[in-house]
Amino acid sequence: MCKADDIDRAVQAANEAFADWREVPVVERARVMFKFKSLLEANYEEIARSVSREHGKTLDEARASVQRGIEVVEFACGIPSLIMGESIENIARNVDCETIRHPLGVCVGITPFNFPAMVPLWMYPVALTCGNTFVLKPSEKVPLTSLLIAELLIQAGIPSGVFNVVHGGKEAVDALLTHPLVKAVSFVGSTPVARYIYETGTAHGKRVQSAGGAKNHIIIMPDADMEQTVQALKASAFGCAGERCMAGSLALPVGDAADMLVPQLAQSASRMKVGRTDTGDNVDMGPVITADHRKRIEGLIQSGCAEGAELVLDGRKVSVPEAPDGFYLGPTIFDKATPKMTIVREEIFGPVLSVVRVNTLEEAIAIGRDCPYGNGAVIFTSSGRTAREFKHHFNAGMIGVNVGVPAPMAWFPFTGWNNSFFGDLHIQGRESIQFYTQQKMTMTRWFAPSKSKFQDPIWKPKS
């Protein structure tokens, strides 16, 4: 684990490399990303297997996450056409104005355990192509995949010192947040830590984008295609063992939709196979990340029972004989939960779905507006009018219609609201380019050589 002096060496190396890297033409920096993308694709299966081994995802889930990361590298390859400024010729007589974007310097990424490849790739390909240098601190729970990918970046031609990986806990984080040479910090993780990252980083003069936790609402209207809804909701709630910030953790069936949804979903989820993801067996869910995390989830399940929710499917009863000491939980479903219950208010970050029955769309939207988070929300409906009302009124940054998860896409910003995000410019999309650069306006005037008298640049209307 890195100490403060190790962090300082990494930041110093990045700062020293910045002077040369920023002067490399942006098209040449993009060519490094093209090579990097090719290497990621060539080593796709090895990276996915590393993710699966480290985190416990199924191999298919790991593959999907790696592909999402590669798409950000693909986006970064196009930065030369996206980083262009604006100009006005003759804004005054013989005066031209233009804007250009400059890199910031040393940027930092602090990333979570749940997506060891994808989330870091949300950050540094864009930062590097914009001309910055980078220090990545991945979660100490999943240290290896980041190093595997870093080796590919070196093979792609990234110069020494431009990209650095450090490992550590809070001491390492604090050293990065307070280091005077660090200009910007990107973070993805829980809301308490996201708030700490934002407050500490900005207090020390950093530009910060800090993505926190979520409680994603899924509204099911009576006119929804129930078969499609059940399959999408099952994948949303229990995919990646629920360890993702876009997991669908709260279902809000409207009217009699609940009587159709709950039994079908419980029956389908009960057939999901939970087990080891490293044996080649076809399983639907792997373990959660640690024994402590499983204990926390079990405590929240117990709170749901104690507060009066109806436990329809109990994932604590799952058995994995080939790994009796593994950190396994099966799909868990609560019905007839109420908005003030702990399982409804708190992010669980595990395979637990709570169902709150409502009478109208307006009631579902009101519950969403009362939620302290605002990452994502989804509606299942066959009505365009209903979908439009939902999109317009629901209080969240990522909205889906008839999709299980409004997944973050490389070309669009990951727009969390409320306590799901702290900062001004979001991760991914064009906003990420704005985050990793600063804008300069230049005003240029050239005098006409044949004129000897003063040439006033101020535009004056004719009298």
Please state what every model-predicted region is.
Residues A14, R29, V51, V73, ...:
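Residue-level signal for inorganic ion chemistry
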Residues G85-Q228, N282, V358, G423:
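Rossmann-like NAD(P) dinucleotide-binding subdomain of oxidoreductase/dehydrogenase enzymes
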Residues M1-R49, R53, V358:
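Short, structured beta/alpha segment
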